[in-house]
Curated annotation (Swiss-Prot):
It is found in: Plastid, Chloroplast. PROSITE patterns: RIBOSOMAL_S18. This is Small ribosomal subunit protein bS18c. Belongs to the bacterial ribosomal protein bS18 family. GO terms for biological process: translation. Residues 1-23 are annotated as: Disordered. GO terms for cellular component: chloroplast; mitochondrial small ribosomal subunit. Part of the 30S ribosomal subunit. Keywords: Chloroplast, Plastid, Ribonucleoprotein, Ribosomal protein, RNA-binding, rRNA-binding. Residues 1-19 have a biased composition (Basic residues). It comes from the Eukaryota. One of its GO terms (molecular function) is small ribosomal subunit rRNA binding. The lineage of its organism: Eukaryota, Viridiplantae, Streptophyta, Embryophyta, Tracheophyta.
Length: 101
């Protein structure tokens, strides 16, 4: 087929493959806080496998390491707890409310 007859074909873009977050030399361990902290959200939650871009086996090891670190008090269970602030409340109306019929 001639190229002029295919008006809607897009050229394929090249893309750069991302580096894996865990290198081959990295050891997933509860004491390796610099590695573990990359897989925790700001609230202290364990990030999902899709977000982390790791394999299933690596995600399992990360989860176990994070849980062990939490139990041994190396990591907090929760971080950035919301501070409840009292906001200015609106004053109540003192008049009786009547229903219109």
């Amino acid at each position: 087929m001639n190229k002029s007859k295919r008006p809607f074909t897009k050229s394929k873009r090249s893309f750069r493959r991302r580096l894996p977050p865990i290198q081959s030399g990295d050891r997933i361990d509860y004491r390796n806080m610099s590695l573990i902290s990359r897989f925790i959200s700001e609230q202290g939650k364990i990030l999902s496998r899709r977000v982390n871009r790791v394999t299933l086996k690596q995600q399992r090891l990360i989860t176990i390491a994070i849980k062990q670190a939490r139990i041994l008090s190396l990591l907090p269970f929760l971080t950035n707890q919301k501070q409840f602030e009292r906001s200015e409340s609106t004053p109540r109306t003192t008049s009786l409310r009547t229903r219109k019929k």
